[in-house]
A protein has these predicted regions:
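C-terminal capping region of solenoid repeat domains
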Residues: 2-45, 207-229, 234-303, 307-482
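N-terminal adaptor-interaction module of cullin-RING ubiquitin ligase components
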Residues: 1-163, 168-226, 237-242, 249, ...
């Protein structure tokens, strides 16, 4: 009785020493009613406004730790937060439809310090054109990373104008675009800090006879990674690859043409390569042996190159003694086997990861790998007709450092799993898939003998459910397909 609740919010005036030119959010405090018979009095208690006293740099750090959705919500609080959030944004991904052109001035006036930009367009829509890309480059002169996906309306002229405005670019990734060699050369000639270049399905390069060579340009001195995927006439990038003396990683996938001769020239000129991926290329032992000049080679991926044999692998292994990761998928060609793997075991003693798909090693090579490669921690054997219980038992007994093992589509049975449960003391994860002779009873065996081991078991056969299973048993870290 005698009390009333007021809904009016009273804001206090800021002290003169706290006032500044920036706009601060206004805070209100609860009104505390004082009980009096006929007159209600209110006392206003002012809470300190610590947030508004934070410098812009500190506020930006807070925003950077938030999710994208939370950042958007924060930008609606006040004008200052909107400005700071826009200036501190590190990455922006946009639907690159043609109507984006009209939004460029307002959008990039807010995000005027953006370092990373992704522009994606779907196949059924008309993408942005040269005018929009040039407008973006004028607003984002500090851009260091650009990703273009299906921007089919961009031409060589647009890429050239972009390169003139964004000379600090360090990373460029483009896929399903239609500009050609002139546009790519403009990037290489105007972006001396470019370190990473990824090109996928560049439609502007069609005729091999008339195609303009790409590179090397000013970017050749700084490039460290080049990835080419599904590029017709990818050999046009030969001058760029050869001229990139500091190149560390080269990835070639599904690029047409014969690559043997070019790989030989590349290996002779670019000897500092540490990682090479060759996938679905027309390459033979000549091309596979070429990286033998790269004495610092640490990672080699050889995927679906049916013309490569043990001969090429031996030549590479004899000189590339720092090899740490070897990935071989020969697509059931059965031309790489014990001879090549024995050479790897003899010369590549630093091997840490080995993935064999469609390869048929026997106990001979596996035992030598286990004995010599004492640092081997990750091993995958997939689609092999020769990896059975004997080979798995050998691995269990000899691979002391092994931490992760994957076995798929191999003639392994419960006997091999039992040997595995008793061996490999440092093993932390095992994956067994589509090995039909392995039963789900191995799950109990691993649980009893190696309780901390993470096991993923899928034999490919339906599993009969046990009604008595469960109860107080701890949950197993085993994936069972039913």
């Amino acid at each position: 009785m005698g009390q009333s609740t007021s809904t009016a919010l009273i804001t206090s005036r800021r002290d003169s020493h706290l006032s500044s030119q920036r706009s601060k959010p206004k805070f209100t405090v609860p009104i505390i009613p004082m009980e009096v018979e006929e007159l209600t009095e209110y006392v206003l208690v002012e809470a300190p406004d610590y947030i508004s006293d934070l410098p812009d740099e500190c506020l930006a750090c807070v925003f950077q730790s938030l999710s994208s959705g939370d950042r958007k919500c924060c930008s609606l609080v006040c004008r200052r937060w909107l400005r700071v959030e826009g200036q501190s944004r590190q990455r922006l991904s946009l639907n690159a439809h043609s109507d984006l052109l009209h939004l460029v001035p307002s959008l990039f006036s807010r995000f005027d310090a953006l370092p990373k930009l992704c522009l994606k367009c779907d196949r059924r829509s008309v993408s942005i054109g040269d005018e929009a890309l040039v407008a973006i480059s004028i607003h984002c002169r500090n851009l260091t990373r650009l990703k273009l996906r299906a921007c089919r309306e961009l031409t060589d002229s647009g890429m050239a104008a972009f390169a003139q405005n964004c000379k600090a670019l360090k990373k460029l990734s483009c896929g399903s675009c239609t500009f050609g060699a002139k546009g790519m050369n403009a990037i290489l000639d105007n972006c001396p800090s470019l370190e990473y270049l990824s090109v996928k399905r560049l439609r502007g390069i069609t005729d091999a006879a008339t195609a303009e060579p790409i590179g090397p340009g000013l970017a050749a001195a700084s490039l460290k990674t080049i990835c080419l995927k599904e590029v017709y006439n990818g050999q046009c990038f030969g001058p760029l690859i050869i001229g990139s003396k500091n190149l560390k990683t080269l990835k070639l996938s599904r690029c047409s043409g014969d690559w043997d001769k070019l790989l030989q020239v590349i290996a002779d000129r670019v000897t500092g390569l540490a990682e090479i991926h060759l996938e679905r290329l027309q390459v033979s032992d000549t091309g596979l042996a070429a990286p033998s000049n790269c004495l610092n080679l640490e990672i080699l991926h050889l995927v679906k190159t049916p013309e490569c044999t043990d001969t090429g692998l031996v030549s590479m292994a004899e000189r590339c003694r720092l090899l740490r990761k070897l990935y071989i998928d020969i697509w059931k060609a059965n031309r790489i086997g014990d001879d090549g793997l024995v050479a790897v075991a003899k010369h590549c003693l630093n091997l840490q990861e080995l993935v064999l798909i469609g390869v048929n090693p026997t106990q001979i090579s596996l035992e030598l790998l286990a004995s010599n490669c004492q640092k081997l921690e990750r091993l995958a054997l997939c689609g092999s007709d020769t990896v059975g219980d004997v080979e798995i038992s050998c691995i269990a007994a000899k691979c002391v450092a092994l931490k992760k093992l994957c076995i798929k589509n191999c003639p392994v049975s419960d006997h091999g799993m039992e040997a595995l449960a008793n061996g490999c003391p440092n093993l932390v994860k095992v994956k067994v898939k589509n090995c039909r002779a392995v039963t789900y009873g191995c799950a109990d065996l691993f649980r009893i003998k190696r309780g901390s081991l993470a096991v993923n078991l899928d034999s490919g056969e339906p599993r009969h459910q046990d009604a008595s299973a469960g109860g107080g048993v701890a949950q197993e870290n085993i994936a069972r397909k039913s």
